[in-house]
A protein has these predicted regions:
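Alpha-helical transmembrane segments of multi-pass membrane proteins
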Residues: 73-92, 143-150, 169-195, 209, ...
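Hydrophobic alpha-helical transmembrane segments of ABC transporter permease domains
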Residues: 31, 35, 39-43, 68, ...
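Transmembrane helix-loop-helix hairpins at lipid-water interfaces of multipass membrane proteins
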Residues: 20, 26-80, 160-165, 276-280
Length: 481
């Protein structure tokens, strides 16, 4: 799905588009769900038939044949349950994988400016726990709603064929309950969105605390970091309490409905029996069908929570996916080829978004092979100028050219492939030394890696390590001295 689709489509349209590649698994899940619902609906009807026809006539052979069929039906039901459990969750995981890949790819494509304000912990939350909520929503919600709908409607149809007056009373009660459920959904959804927001905040503080753990210990500031974390932790606790309060109201309403529905069946059914409009067998059948409502209604209660969590996470997902890169290739952008290395900086000015000018009317011309050092006080714009050359940001005024080509007229990919950048904050991936060196040229041979290590004057140090170039450097190079 491209950026245009995320801009033009509604959230649920975006959500349903992820079903398309896995529609066969989804269809299998729905067919098995339908089969389970039909088996559950058949049991009370078969029980009624046995009580009416077989038991009074002492039809032993037919009775046991029917019981054998029921037994086989429940074996099939178990098979269908296995299929729903295994393949249904497989379907959900595949959708989650697609969501996560699209989100990670989109994050990779965002401009430098986005990460000036973005928090790593929030992004981690959206890539992990919030995508899990969307997965549970994708897998369970359609299945549970489908089973519940088929079971409730099917049971009502059968009950109308038995005694329409009692069935009508039940049919009137159910929409009232569903209306209350729908209203509860909105309060739970709003509470769930707040939980997601606070969860992202606590992940941000957690990530920051872990990343700065050595610094905190060096300055004996553990208590300060704990206070910061406690504040976010308590806010998350309060948001969870609000969510559980909304969920508690919903569950209380649901339990009241189930109890009152059983009471209505006994009360109205008893009155109909006393007026010779209903018999005991049909009342038992009605009670059995009402009991079949219990599982679907309980599923609906869980589904409402899944919908609340899933739609809240989906909303945050779509918001992030709709965030566009501030820097894009020009329609007529060309690839830099056969780069010599001449850099022309002409009357460049630059200001970060909503900030004062960092650079004003800077001009500089660097010949191929020439070495230039920018020297000055902190905050003078040295790093900013170096980040404008590979076009991590766009100049506010003036221009920067490489071999006579304005960097805004070159593709960003070709710029980044031809310009090497060593960041102020050195970052090493949790991989081998060889793979970290190869990162600047993914197809580099081992000979090229060794040559690069010798040029950086680290070859001898590497060879003194037990595993040489295969030595794992750890997270951010923590295993190196």
């Amino acid at each position: 799905m491209n950026q245009k689709d995320f801009k033009n489509k509604r959230e649920m349209q975006i959500f349903l588009s992820y079903f398309k590649p896995h529609r066969k698994l989804f269809l299998l899940d729905m067919v098995c769900a339908l089969a389970i619902a039909l088996i559950d609906l058949a049991f009370p009807f078969i029980s009624r038939w046995c009580m009416y026809k077989l038991l009074p006539d002492n039809a032993w052979r037919t009775f046991w044949t029917v019981m054998a069929v029921v037994f086989c039906a429940y074996i099939l039901r178990s098979v269908f349950t296995y299929i729903i459990t295994y393949w249904g969750h497989t379907f959900g995981v595949r959708i989650e994988t697609d969501f996560r890949r699209d989100l990670f790819q989109h994050i990779q494509e965002l401009s430098y400016a986005y990460f000036d304000n973005a928090r790593v912990g929030q992004l981690m939350s959206q890539l992990t726990s919030e995508l899990f909520d969307i997965t549970e929503f994708a897998h369970h919600a359609p299945e549970d709603i489908f089973i519940s709908t088929v079971t409730i409607i099917g049971a009502l149809i059968i009950m109308f064929t038995i005694q329409w007056k009692l069935a009508l009373v039940i049919a009137i009660t159910i929409p009232i309950f569903l209306l209350i459920v729908w209203k509860c959904r909105f309060s739970m959804q709003n509470a769930s969105r707040n939980v997601k927001k606070e969860m992202a905040a606590i992940n941000t503080d957690f990530e920051s605390g872990l990343s700065g753990l050595r610094t905190a210990k060096a300055f004996a500031n553990e208590d300060k970091e704990l206070d910061k974390f406690d504040s976010a932790n308590l806010s998350y606790r309060d948001s969870k309490a609000d969510f559980y309060r909304a969920m508690g109201r919903f569950n209380a309403v649901m339990e009241f409905f189930m109890c009152i529905l059983s009471a209505i069946v006994i009360a109205v059914g008893g009155a109909l029996i006393m007026s010779d409009q209903l018999n005991i067998i049909d009342l038992i059948t009605f009670s059995l069908y009402v009991s079949t409502f219990v599982n679907p209604v309980r599923k609906l209660s869980t589904t409402v929570e899944l919908i609340a969590n899933g739609t809240a996470s989906l909303h945050r997902y779509v918001q992030l996916m709709r965030t566009e890169a501030t820097l894009k290739d020009a329609p007529d952008a060309t690839e830099l080829q056969d780069v010599k290395g001449r850099i022309d900086i002409d009357h460049v000015g630059f200001a970060y978004e909503g900030d004062h000018d960092v650079l004003q009317d800077v001009s500089l011309h660097i010949a191929p092979g020439e070495t230039i050092a920018f020297v000055g006080s902190s905050g003078g714009g040295k790093t900013t100028l170096s980040q404008l050359i590979p076009r991590f940001y766009d100049v506010t005024s003036g221009s920067i050219s490489i071999d006579g080509t304005d960097v805004r007229k070159a593709t960003q990919e070709s710029l980044h492939k031809n310009i090497g950048v060593v960041q102020q904050e050195v970052f090493l991936f949790a991989d081998s030394i060889a793979e970290n060196i190869r990162y600047g040229k993914l197809d580099a041979t081992m000979d090229e890696i060794i040559r690069a290590a010798k040029m950086a004057e680290i070859y001898d140090d590497i060879m003194e390590m037990p595993k040489g170039f295969d030595t794992n450097v750890g997270e951010r190079g923590a295993l190196l001295s």
